[in-house]
Regions:
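An N-terminal, well-structured beta->alpha segment
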Residues: 1-79, 400-403
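C-terminal charged capping/lid subdomain of soluble metabolic enzymes
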Residues: 2-8, 326-403
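N-terminal small/polar loop signature for handling phosphorylated ligands or for N-terminal nucleophile
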Residues: 50, 58-130, 245-256
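Glycine/threonine-rich beta-strand-loop-alpha-helix active-site module
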Residues: 90-194
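Glycine-rich phosphate/pyrophosphate-binding beta-alpha loops
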Residues: 157, 265-297, 375-378
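Carboxylate- and glycine-rich phosphate/diphosphate-binding segment that chelates Mg2+/Mn2+
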Residues: 165-273
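Active-site pocket-lining segment
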Residues: 291-354
């Protein structure tokens, strides 16, 4: 990256960091069981709810316990279950039409990050009916209060239940972009481990490593605060302590509970401190090839950490020691190597590969431009790179025979 652009990026990031204490960040109020929602809706005078989820969650009956409580208390609801991985503008518009048609007055995002992000985007379109989602992409362009929004994560990974971001894919161009504004933070989050116990091992692994990526990128960036560092360290330790237990035994309710807390803490960290190039590259792959976001993050994370080199040794040392991966007596480089090796070991245990056969060489310049546009100047990354410099990651992610 040339010096002028690099200077602009760092000045932008510095200004944003200075503004953090004055911005209206908040955390959602947390419940630990879906049964608590009936009292909330009765108290708020909510009559009709739109539940945004996906077909798999509905098919496997994950909604049933909550719906039983709603039926018992005569709370009306309608279900939109067409959300796809990497939710599209089409999903958002279909769900919005159902909300308006049925005269709903609250929204529940029930599922992984896709369902919760879709719910946030629907809320934004309800709040600003004359403005398209593409006009809201970027930062601080929603402004208006959303309908009452409740997030119920069925995966421990995205942290969307506590963040100000919604990531949406344009149905026509397949460009994936983020909408970032404070009204998108859900009013309530339900961290109920019982809705996560049927999550298969593969998704337990990739969504858990998604949360790890949130925590690590938030911690190594240049816009951390005392609070975000605390949340990122807690999340990192909880993940290393519990992800293998949840992967090996999906019925381990305590491990599931701790992973939900880790995801929430990681979300609290990155919603203020942001992420980095791992996410930017992952989003560009998800938009074009529909590669699941958690899988992309898990695959990319160690290669980017290695590439940052000595600029992050001290911070990785701090994470490694806190998580019990390294000793305080280790020097920074040794501890950083141990931390990255632990991530690689995690990938191997979960049978996550190092490449994606979907990547086409001719797509790389466009994909890297999208990653550059997402990350710069917003993400306070340890090492700045432009689109051309980011191309190396796509080549590293290609199978050898495809290069």
């Amino acid at each position: 990256m040339n010096k002028c652009k690099a200077a602009y990026c760092r000045i932008f990031q510095k200004c944003f960091k200075i503004a953090i204490p004055f911005l209206p960040y908040r955390h959602p109020e947390v419940f630990y069981s879906t049964s608590k929602l009936t009292g909330l809706f009765e108290e708020k005078g909510i009559d009709t709810i739109l539940i945004i989820t996906d077909a798999g969650i509905r098919k496997f009956g994950l909604l049933d316990r909550m719906l039983m409580h709603f039926d018992h208390h005569n709370i009306h609801y309608f279900i939109y279950d067409k959300t796809v991985a990497n939710p599209t503008t089409t999903n958002v518009e279909e769900a919005r039409e159902l909300y308006l048609e049925k005269h709903c007055d609250a929204i529940i995002g029930f599922g992984g990050g896709s369902s919760i992000d879709c719910a946030k985007a629907v809320g934004a379109r309800i709040a600003k009916p004359k403005q398209s989602l593409s006009k809201m992409k970027g930062i601080l362009k929603v402004h208006k209060k959303l309908p009452l929004l409740v997030a119920i994560p069925t995966t421990a990974g995205t942290g969307s239940e506590t963040t100000l971001a919604a990531v949406i894919t344009d149905a026509q161009t397949r460009h994936k972009y983020a909408i970032n504004d404070f009204p998108l933070i859900p009013a309530y989050a339900v961290l109920d481990p019982k809705v996560t116990i049927s999550l298969p091992p593969s998704l337990t692994a990739t969504t858990g490593m998604d949360a790890l990526t949130h925590a690590v990128e938030a911690y190594i960036g240049g816009s951390t605060t005392r609070h975000t560092r605390k949340y990122a360290k807690k999340a990192t330790k909880l993940i290393f302590d519990n992800i293998y237990k949840a992967y090996d035994d999906g019925q381990n309710i305590e491990a599931r509970k701790e992973m939900l807390k880790a995801s929430f803490f990681a979300g609290c960290a990155f919603t203020k401190s942001y992420v980095g190039y791992v996410h930017a590259v992952a989003h560009s792959l998800g938009g074009k090839y529909n590669i699941p976001h958690g899988l992309a993050n898990a695959t990319i994370l160690p290669m980017v950490l290695e590439d940052y080199g000595s600029t992050i040794y001290k911070k990785l040392y701090q994470l490694a020691v806190y998580a019990g991966i390294a000793d305080e007596s280790d020097d920074y480089e040794v501890a950083a190597d141990k931390f990255i090796s632990a991530i690689k070991d995690m990938k191997k245990y979960f049978q996550i590969g190092d490449t994606f056969s979907e990547i086409q060489k001719e797509d790389i310049p466009e994909r890297s431009r999208y990653a550059d546009k997402e990350a710069n100047p917003l993400y306070p990354v340890p090492v700045l790179m432009n689109a051309k410099e980011l191309e190396k990651y796509y080549y590293m992610l290609m199978p050898e025979e495809e290069k």
